Curated annotation (Swiss-Prot):
Entry keyword Lyase: yes
Species in which this protein is naturally found: Colwellia psychrerythraea (strain 34H / ATCC BAA-681)
UniProt keyword Transferase present: no
UniProt protein name: Putative pterin-4-alpha-carbinolamine dehydratase
Gene Ontology molecular function terms on file: 4-alpha-hydroxytetrahydrobiopterin dehydratase activity
GO biological process: tetrahydrobiopterin biosynthetic process
Amino acid sequence: MTVQSNNKLASQVCEACHVDAPKVSDEELKELIGLIPDWVPQVRDNVMMLEREYKFKNYKLAWAFANKVSELAESEFHHPSILLEWGKVTVTWWTHSIGGLHKNDFICAAKTDQLGD
């Protein structure tokens, strides 16, 4: 992954998303995931999601990162699932209102990556 490609997404702002907003197409998924290759598309309960696991030296560092992700979520008005474990945080982005992936999820994933820098 290049920093430049990640910044292309991270510099964007999430748009308000409604129930009738379009999910990303298969073609868009391939293009966008190429900008954030550490993220893995997952399907759970027939819902496509983006997931990434971050590793840390201890619980306190993982906790601090989870708090940063929470602050990002509040600032973007877009909220992921955050699983905090000893030395590990798993972040999962998807758009609840459309039951799948929207461009906002990729923007937030790229911004999440920058929190670790």
